[in-house]
């Protein structure tokens, strides 16, 4: 997919000591993607900019982690409407109200010492990209669960120009690469259909209808033979985006 010979993007470098990028519909054993999904990053970017509606963007996701562990946690879930479980004897006082609740044991995958290299560009709106660059220096960045705070590397995070070219080096980080590009480069990996964004919902009772992007999780040290976008520090950039968005 060709966007032009060059463009300005935000390169956001993050570190998380322990994080879970939850795979949807994993319960009991909460599994994690190896890298955050486009939907998580889209939500993070829109939240940092206080955007109340969706604006199209391109996202490149790469990173490494040292290891993975499984934590055992006790999970408590409170009913939004206590009347929905009239026979539930488990009552918990929350503030000034009493809630019915359920509790159970859950196993959660956690990635350890995760370093992320994200390239983000709003489509046809360079001003939003520049504003996002300002906000990551001023606000707390959260990616993954609500308590998965990320540390921003202020020295490596910057606005950068990406251009079409060939990287002479192998991949330094594992990355999500569009399926067609992975096939052209004859690179194998784990195939994912990742959530990118969901259609607006009115309340918690409505199901989120997601739009997905097909990609391959490619391990570091692979060589990219085809022409690729490269940033100013010679890092390859593989944009994920939804088709027909402007």
Report residues per predicted region.
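Internal, well-folded beta-alpha domain core
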Residues: 68-246
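Extracellular structured ligand-interaction cores
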Residues: 7, 56-58, 113-115
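A general structural signal for short secondary-structure junctions and capping/turn motifs
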Residues: 1-2, 48-53, 108-111
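N-terminal, Lys/Arg- and Ser/Thr-rich interaction peptides
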Residues: 2-26
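Glycine/small-residue-rich interface belts in oligomeric ring/scaffold proteins
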Residues: 23-91
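Short, structured patches in soluble enzyme cores that scaffold and shape functional sites
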Residues: 14-16, 63, 120-122
């Amino acid at each position: 997919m060709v966007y032009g010979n060059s463009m300005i993007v935000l390169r956001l470098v993050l570190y998380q000591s322990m994080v879970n990028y939850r795979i949807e519909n994993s319960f009991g054993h909460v599994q994690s993607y190896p890298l955050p999904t486009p939907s998580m990053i889209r939500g993070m970017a829109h939240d940092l900019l206080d955007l109340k509606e969706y604006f199209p963007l391109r996202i490149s996701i790469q990173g490494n982690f040292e290891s993975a562990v499984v934590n055992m946690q006790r999970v408590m879930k409170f009913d939004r409407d206590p009347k929905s479980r009239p026979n539930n004897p488990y009552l918990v006082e929350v503030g000034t109200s009493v809630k019915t609740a359920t509790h159970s044991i859950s196993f959660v995958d956690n990635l350890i010492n995760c370093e992320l290299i994200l390239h983000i560009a709003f489509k046809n709106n360079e001003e939003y990209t520049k504003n996002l660059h300002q906000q990551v220096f001023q606000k707390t960045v959260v990616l993954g669960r609500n308590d998965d705070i990320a540390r921003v590397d202020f020295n490596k995070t910057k606005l950068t120009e990406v251009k079409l070219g060939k990287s002479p080096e192998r991949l330094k980080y594992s990355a999500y690469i569009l399926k067609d590009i992975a096939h052209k480069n004859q690179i194998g990996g784990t195939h994912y259909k990742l959530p990118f964004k969901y259609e607006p919902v009115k309340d918690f009772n409505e199901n989120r209808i997601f739009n997905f992007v097909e990609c391959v999780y490619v391990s570091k040290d692979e060589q990219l033979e085809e022409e690729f976008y490269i940033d100013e520090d010679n890092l390859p950039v593989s944009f994920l985006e939804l088709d027909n968005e402007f």
